[in-house]
């Protein structure tokens, strides 16, 4: 299934894109020495890991995440699962960093490897789900979104991957638009039972770097998402229907 997103570049959105471009250019020419860049990147990795896992309910504090990032063994009673999630996310971040400057197309295999690292810490690759999943309201338990059937997931993911590689190569659309649409479509398809959000955010980071919007690796988009969580969720829930096939 081809992915042909339907969207409008409004005047307001155009102004935002111009503002983003202005800040990007300022960062690109910012005179920062190598040591400072390395330190800022390490901080960005720490914050990206903390906030992306926090969005999904991880209870570790920044100081605890920092301890794990420095090779600490954890030892936080009752938070063993949280520790594994953080360690796995660090590994997934490290993996996508090896892909930033890769001129070859992004593949479904790589996306599956990213997801596998997120969930298990292994790069063996996770198959797409084989059954139906649903997204429920965390408080009421009611179904708020019904993703596509499992039989359609491979074709939808193939279409998404083909589209994003075309955009990376041809630069038809602004990078922030491509990243946002890719994030939205991945979350909409929900190709896995768990780990979709973390994988989507990592894919977004990879796309931005591939399109020249890495911002020297010194910023954490995940921190922005977490600190604007309601707006983040609302942006992923702007469709007219609770069912994928109904729009």
Regions of interest found by a model, annotated:
Residues 1-247:
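FIC/Doc superfamily catalytic core
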């Amino acid at each position: 299934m081809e992915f042909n997103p339907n969207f409008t570049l409004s005047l307001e959105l155009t102004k935002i894109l111009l503002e983003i471009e202005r800040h990007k250019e300022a960062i690109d020419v910012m005179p920062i020495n190598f040591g400072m860049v390395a330190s800022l990147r390490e901080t960005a990795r720490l914050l990206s890991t903390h906030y992306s896992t926090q969005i999904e309910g991880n209870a570790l504090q920044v100081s605890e995440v920092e301890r794990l990032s420095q090779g600490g063994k954890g030892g936080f009673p009752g938070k063993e699962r949280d520790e594994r999630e953080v360690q796995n996310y660090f590994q997934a971040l490290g993996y996508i960093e090896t892909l930033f400057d890769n001129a070859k197309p992004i593949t479904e295999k790589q996306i599956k490897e990213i997801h596998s690292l997120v969930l298990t810490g292994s790069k063996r690759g996770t198959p797409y789900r084989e059954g139906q999943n649903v997204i429920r309201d965390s408080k009421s338990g009611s179904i708020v979104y019904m993703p596509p059937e499992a039989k359609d997931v491979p074709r939808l993911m193939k279409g998404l991957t083909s589209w994003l590689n075309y955009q990376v190569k041809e630069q038809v659309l602004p990078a922030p638009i491509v990243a946002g649409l890719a994030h939205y479509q991945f979350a909409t398809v929900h190709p896995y039972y768990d780990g979709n959000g973390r994988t989507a955010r990592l894919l977004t980071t990879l796309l931005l770097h591939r399109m020249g919007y890495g911002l020297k690796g010194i910023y954490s988009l995940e921190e922005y998402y977490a600190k604007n969580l309601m707006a983040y969720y609302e942006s992923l829930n702007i469709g007219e229907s609770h069912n994928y096939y109904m729009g």
